Amino acid sequence: MDRYCVFGNPIGHSKSPLIHRLFAEQTGQVLTYEARLAPLDDFIGDARAFFAEGLGANVTVPFKEEAFRLADELSERARRAGAVNTLKKLEGGRLLGDNTDGAGLTRDLQDNAGFALTGKRILVLGAGGAVRGVLEPFLAQKPAVLVIANRTVAKAEQLVREFADLGPLVAAGFDWLDAPVDLIVNGTSASLGGELPPIAPSLIQPGHTLCYDMMYGKEPTAFNRWAFDQGAARCLDGLGMLVEQAAEAFELWRGVRPNTAPVLAELRRQLAG
């Protein structure tokens, strides 16, 4: 049977096996998909062992940069991201590395939330790997401007230098900004600790600005609770991004696009339970 997996460490919390099982059932694809705890000091060895038989894998924290180095070929979006979250075995055993994170977020915003990015003023908080992965897909939608705000401004400036050829990018500190924007994406991990990036409430235009946290949980994240209190039009979490990036990977492997809506609904139901 065709084998797939997700590599991570830790990995017990992963929803990927459930997501891909539901995708496979829905599309009539016959495959297995497992969560695989890779050793912190030998991801590449474990990945090579899996790909002796396996056909594809997702890669999560902390192995995305190592997967980038493992890949024999890279998609343009993976090359830009400097990280790989999806591997596919090609003819002859070569590995293609892709990054579906940014495409997943873009699709969640545009298809599921009905929010077009074209012509919008976008603020992205953070300058780490999660943000790097979304810049190419976001800029492909031709926003009016995309501002990267970070505590260490030099990191944001580095991303601007790397991606400036793709569209209008600006670097800023968290406290440099006060004019309202159309979309704020929290790409920091602050919500994991119940904390907030130190940004001005005036960035949110009540009833207009959409706020999106890449993190998700049973309860609204700290960032989304704050955004709601400031009058944000909508506050979305990263569960839709998780399901949509998985669908991108599934389509890359199997050549068929699953319907994400029932899968996202099932995950929401389980999360609430």
Curated annotation (Swiss-Prot):
NADP(+) binds at E76, G126, A127, G128, G129, A130, N150, R151, T152, V153, A154, K155, M214, G238. Its EC number is 1.1.1.25. It is an enzyme of class 1 (oxidoreductase). The keyword Coiled coil does not apply. It catalyses: shikimate + NADP(+) = 3-dehydroshikimate + NADPH + H(+). Pathway: Metabolic intermediate biosynthesis; chorismate biosynthesis; chorismate from D-erythrose 4-phosphate and phosphoenolpyruvate: step 4/7. One of its GO terms (cellular component) is cytosol. Keywords: Amino-acid biosynthesis, Aromatic amino acid biosynthesis, NADP, Oxidoreductase. GO terms for biological process: amino acid biosynthetic process; aromatic amino acid family biosynthetic process; chorismate biosynthetic process; shikimate metabolic process. The keyword Oxidoreductase applies. CDD domains: NAD_bind_Shikimate_DH. Shikimate binds at S14, K15, S16, T60, N85, D101, Y216. Involved in the biosynthesis of the chorismate, which leads to the biosynthesis of aromatic amino acids. Catalyzes the reversible NADPH linked reduction of 3-dehydroshikimate (DHSA) to yield shikimate (SA). Homodimer. Belongs to the shikimate dehydrogenase family. This is Shikimate dehydrogenase (NADP(+)). The gene is aroE.
